[in-house]
């Protein structure tokens, strides 16, 4: 899984609007593979979505790197500039910084996610975790996702 992710990351290079300036590509591709294992479908990997489910729904996978196992109160995030992507569903994954383990957290229909999530502006400090937001985004707790 890691080798496949490294290969795809090298092939892709730095993405435009990348919050981590391309440094999260390997974790992102690992996250896509984890979501694919959990959801089924085909790995499509386009700008607008990453997976196409057997029912034709398009899924965009959002991956965060972490040093610890995720807890239900941790946030899942979608950057504001990503909300224009033509997907039906967001799926969320966390991958340990050393790539030794990953967690499929759940998913939610895009429209429902954007309605339920809290909008944060770049530079805002999230009061739930004291994190300074790096880009305008929509945050939702892991426990609010569907598994």
Task: For the regions a language model picked out, list residue spans one by one.
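Nucleic-acid endonuclease domains
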Residues: 1-57, 62-147
């Amino acid at each position: 899984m890691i080798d496949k992710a490294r290969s795809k990351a090298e092939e892709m290079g730095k993405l435009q609007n990348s919050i981590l300036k391309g440094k999260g590509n390997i974790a992102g591709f690992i996250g896509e593979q984890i979501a694919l294992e959990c959801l089924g479908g085909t790995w499509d990997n386009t700008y607008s979505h990453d997976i196409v489910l057997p029912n034709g729904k398009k899924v965009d996978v959002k991956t965060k790197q972490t040093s610890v196992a995720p807890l239900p109160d941790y946030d899942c995030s979608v950057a504001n500039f990503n909300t224009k992507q033509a997907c039906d569903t967001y799926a969320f994954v966390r991958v340990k910084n050393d790539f030794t383990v990953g967690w499929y957290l759940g998913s939610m229909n895009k429209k429902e996610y954007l309605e339920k999530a809290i909008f944060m502006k770049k530079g805002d400090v999230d009061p739930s975790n004291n994190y300074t937001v790096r880009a305008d985004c929509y945050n939702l707790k892991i426990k609010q996702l569907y598994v």
